[in-house]
Amino acid sequence: MGPRARPALFFLILLRTVAAQGRPPRSHSLRYLFMGASERDHGLPLFEALGYVDDELFVAYNHESRRAESRAQWVLGEAHSQLWLQLSQSLKGWDHMFIVDFWTIMDNHNHSKESHTLQVILGCEVQEDNSTRGFWMYGYDGQDHLEFCPETLDWRAAESRALTTKLEWEVNKIRAKQNRAYLERDCPEQLQWLLELGRGVLDQQVPPLVKVTHHVASAVTTLRCQALNFYPQNITMRWLKDRKPVDVKDAESKDVLPSGDGTYQSWVALAVPPGEEQRYTCQVEHPGLDQPLTATWEPSLSNTLVTGVISGIAVCVIIFLIGILFRILRKRQASRGAMGDYVLAECE
């Protein structure tokens, strides 16, 4: 895997991981993604930042311009507001912090003469009951490296090479407290401000289109439940057998992915015994639905029609053959009857 692909893969995995960690149907999130390369050959600047609200990109920043640029229509009018200026200052501070952390990690790995990448994801989720969850994670060369634990003000090392940096950072309690203050106070406040700005856009709810399809391959029958064109991306999909939940280990699910038009899509599949398809139901929960939606597989009209036509033709052929056989038998009987009358006449 090339150096450019590693940061992208890391962020794709992190985005899915953070989004999938039990987010309730009506929670909201604010995430900042930082990335940088020590050398230009990785195709990245020394520092670049992207900000997302509920997976909607709203701000971008890089080390060369040193200014925050809006990336969404609903924040264009806030370029000179006090909160936007505070956001710009935060990004400038993170720019400096990122570079210092980058050199620290490289020094602790004795990598000062090589080209490497650093990735960071930090932010918070605010749930419907106003409870919050913060996250602050580092990746080095596309691999998990360190994760901040706000409850204990410690860092969790994802690999043994990160232990030196972990111990070094844990000595700085002032920074740890500042990190926690951001995750538990400043980040939720920023998120609420952004949600107010994006009202009518971020709070829209588009219910999913749900359908169940039927597939047979290598003697295995599979039902696939598809949810299409929904927003936001928070969705729960499960299979029921005779109205009882099926063990999630038996089902194959796909991550929620963007459709390309601002909506999302996902699916969950299940292998079922042939002939028992009607015992299984797909249940979908989404903020755009007033109540859980259920769907079952129904044979398409074309399949039913083809089956009916084939059955009809088969019946007609059978009737035709029976008719021919009946006529042959009658002719034979008639022929035998005529011969019998002729012989009797001669005897008289």
Curated annotation (Swiss-Prot):
Tagged with keyword Nucleotide-binding: no
Positions of region (Alpha-1): 23-114
Gene3D superfamilies for the chain: Immunoglobulins, MHC class I-like antigen recognition-like
Signal peptide: 1-22
Annotated spans, Alpha-3: 206-297
Extracellular side stretches: 23-306
Role: Binds to transferrin receptor (TFR) and reduces its affinity for iron-loaded transferrin.
Subunit structure: Binds TFR through the extracellular domain in a pH-dependent manner.
Assigned protein family: Belongs to the MHC class I family.
The protein's name: Hereditary hemochromatosis protein homolog
Name of the gene: HFE
